[in-house]
């Protein structure tokens, strides 16, 4: 039985909801951190974590399944070449949701969704002066 396996409706039609989640998955895979509302973040976690688990085993069938769900070649390449090997030893829990307070316009709860082991792109530069 599949009782209780549905996603939140998020006040959208099914086509709009699936397209929105697909776009959010692609953005998260590309940028490794995105800002969205808390209910969308919780739904995004439910769809992106199985994709990363799929990418841990790089077979042609898994690539085709990932492309069927993502519909973006660059995201599939990054998923299988970068994220799959990075999370190979981790048994799940690839994303982190951080609450960010409330949005100014409509007071919606906001959240930051990020991949757990993401490489810090902007490292703090050290101000060491060489004495010449």
Swiss-Prot record:
One of its GO terms (cellular component) is cytosolic large ribosomal subunit. Keywords: Ribonucleoprotein, Ribosomal protein. Belongs to the bacterial ribosomal protein bL17 family. PROSITE patterns: RIBOSOMAL_L17 (PS01167). The gene is rplQ. Part of the 50S ribosomal subunit. Contacts protein L32. One of its GO terms (biological process) is translation. SUPFAM superfamilies: Prokaryotic ribosomal protein L17. It comes from Albidiferax ferrireducens (strain ATCC BAA-621 / DSM 15236 / T118) (Rhodoferax ferrireducens). HAMAP family: Ribosomal_bL17. The keyword Transcription regulation does not apply. This is Large ribosomal subunit protein bL17. GO terms for molecular function: structural constituent of ribosome. Pfam families: Ribosomal_L17. The keyword Repressor does not apply. Transmembrane segments: none annotated.
């Amino acid at each position: 039985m599949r009782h209780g396996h549905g996603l939140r409706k998020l006040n959208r039609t099914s086509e709009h909801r699936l397209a929105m989640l697909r776009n959010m998955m692609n953005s998260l895979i590309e940028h490794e951190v995105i800002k969205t509302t808390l209910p969308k973040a919780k739904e995004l976690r439910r769809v992106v974590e199985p994709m990363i688990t799929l990418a841990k085993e790089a077979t042609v069938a898994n690539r085709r399944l990932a492309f069927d769900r993502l519909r973006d070649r660059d995201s599939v390449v990054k998923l299988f070449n970068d994220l799959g090997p990075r999370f190979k030893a981790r048994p799940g829990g690839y994303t982190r949701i951080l609450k960010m307070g409330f949005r100014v316009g409509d007071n919606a709860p906001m959240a930051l969704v990020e991949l757990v082991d993401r490489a810090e792109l902007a490292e703090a530069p050290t101000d060491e002066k060489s004495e010449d």
